[in-house]
Amino acid sequence: TKRALGDLITAEYPATIEEALMVPGGAYFPEVKKDTHEVAEPLTGPLRRYVCIDYGLDMLSAHWVQVDTSENAQCYREYDMPDLTAGQAADTLLSITSDEYIDTWLAPPDLWNRRNDTGRSVFDIFYEHGIILTKTSNDLFSGCTGMKEWLRVSEETKRPALTFLKDTCPNLIRCLQKIQKDKNKPKVYAKTPHELTHDVDSLRCFCVWWVRSADKKKNVKKKKWRADLIEDYRNASKEIRALMIKELGEPML
């Protein structure tokens, strides 16, 4: 009977969409709850802003994250849209961002893959449309570890290091709450149902990246670098970036 077989029969023969989502292994982010992770007020003071994306022809998923001088991060905008070309995706992101200054645009390594027919990559197309992407790690375990650390609720503050501005990221929160552990590799989240992975993969780009807090001084004198140096900087390691800043000054990105 279904009662005797429990999770096994639920996974093989789900009666509802909700049952289909609740595969064996359990929720990967059980800590994510609206009462702890969603906040009513935006971060204030000097802020660094990032956009992290997951892109494919089936879906563009993007999230805007701001970080203050105390290493508090807040996701304050999301955007999901299927069937966009790379050029359309870049133009849409720039339009939504408007005049906000974005420190870094974060993306997974597959966007640097060149197509056999054109020899161009998504990175190339975004660059032509005015967005210079920065490559993050695609290591799933490292990314999941980073996400768990950012989303862990502090015993002291009763809040995670990464929060969500109220009513701005409903789909991301839904996906984080629904996505399950990989039943064969419980230390990472499952890649099915695929519909749940876009927003989670996007946020993983931010969480796996080395993130600098906002400068405590509001007025930081920045230097204008050559385009080739800026591209090298965006793709450099933490250590190389520090050396470049030491030699050339803070870049005007």
Features from the language model and the residues they span:
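ATPase catalytic-site recognition across NTP-hydrolyzing enzymes
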Residues: T1-I53
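Hydrophobic alpha-helical scaffolding
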Residues: K2-G6, L162, T192
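Acidic, Mg2+-coordinating catalytic module of metal-dependent nucleases/exonucleases
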Residues: Y13, A190-V220
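A residue-level signal for conserved active-site and pocket-lining positions in enzyme catalytic cores
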Residues: Y13, D54, A62, W105, ...
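Hydrophobic/aromatic-lined pockets within catalytic cores
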Residues: E18, T69, C207, V211
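Short, glycine/acidic-enriched loop or turn micro-motifs at the edges of active sites
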Residues: L57
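Short beta-strand scaffold segments in enzyme catalytic cores
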Residues: L60-Q66
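Mg2+-dependent endonuclease catalytic cores in nucleic-acid-processing enzymes, primarily RNase H-like
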Residues: H63, E71-K191, S213, K217, ...
